[in-house]
């Protein structure tokens, strides 16, 4: 399955969850799009599990193939698989670029990485799924700081999560892996584990 490129607002309304993590999509119309959007049918257990999986997949903007591959990697780690799975997604380069406030959305962050605007430990990395290890640095190329999407994001001064840091020179650090209570608060990752293990 290819990466989704349609309206994220419609997806958020269909899932009943803000995939932009701002809540804006659901303020005006907190129901599914379409003629019968306000009539939400009762979901089966499978439907509930699928919906939870889709919420997370769309939040991070990854294809089904990448999503499942990451899930299988998390099975090889010690600890709770669902929690490890989310931590692997959270340590993706495109996500950390977004968390550092270099862009307003993960889609923009993915674009920056793809186009070679991002340096990791001083070297260009253009793979959005590149997984950062704690202590690695992330920064924009000097000329990339003048991009409109970057300027607008930096001016907005989004609050950073505690597991990334940005210094006065614009160099970000992926300080540590996040604790589970620091991100995606409303997601039940166990439902995703059950979906793939059914």
Curated annotation (Swiss-Prot):
Q: Which Pfam families match?
A: Ribosomal_S4 (PF00163), S4 (PF01479)
Among SUPFAM superfamilies, the record links this protein to:
Alpha-L RNA-binding motif
Task: Spell out the disulfide connections.
Answer: none
MF-aspect GO terms: rRNA binding; structural constituent of ribosome
Q: Its GO biological process terms?
A: ribosomal small subunit biogenesis; translation
**Positions of the UniProt region annotated as Disordered:** 26-45
Q: What InterPro entries is this protein classified in?
A: Ribosomal_uS4, Ribosomal_uS4_bac-type, Ribosomal_uS4_CS, Ribosomal_uS4_N, S4_RNA-bd, S4_RNA-bd_sf
Q: Where is the S4 RNA-binding domain?
A: 91-154
Q: Which PANTHER family match?
A: 30S 40S RIBOSOMAL PROTEIN, SMALL RIBOSOMAL SUBUNIT PROTEIN US4M
Of which family is this protein a member? Belongs to the universal ribosomal protein uS4 family.
According to the record's subunit comment, the protein's assembly and interactions are:
Part of the 30S ribosomal subunit. Contacts protein S5. The interaction surface between S4 and S5 is involved in control of translational fidelity.
Q: This protein is called what?
A: Small ribosomal subunit protein uS4
Which gene produces this protein?
Answer: rpsD
């Amino acid at each position: 399955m290819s990466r989704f490129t349609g309206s994220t607002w419609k997806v958020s309304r269909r899932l009943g969850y803000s995939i932009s993590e701002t809540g804006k999509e659901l303020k005006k119309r907190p129901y599914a799009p379409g003629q019968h959007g306000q009539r939400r049918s009762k979901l089966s257990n499978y439907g509930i599990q699928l919906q939870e999986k889709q919420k997370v997949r769309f939040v991070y903007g990854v294809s089904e193939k990448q999503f499942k591959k990451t899930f299988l990697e998390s099975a090889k780690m010690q600890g709770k698989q669902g929690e490890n799975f989310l931590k692997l997604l959270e340590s993706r380069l495109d996500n950390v670029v977004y968390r550092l406030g270099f862009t307003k959305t993960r889609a923009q962050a993915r674009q920056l990485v793809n186009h070679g605007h991002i340096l990791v430990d001083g070297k260009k990395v253009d793979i959005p799924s590149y997984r950062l290890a704690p202590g690695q640095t992330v920064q924009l190329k000097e000329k990339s700081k003048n991009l409109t999407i970057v300027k607008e994001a930096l001016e907005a001064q989004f609050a950073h999560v505690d597991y990334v840091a940005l210094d006065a020179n614009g160099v970000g650090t992926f300080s540590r892996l996040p604790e589970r209570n620091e991100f995606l608060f409303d997601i039940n990752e166990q439902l995703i584990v059950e979906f793939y293990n059914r």
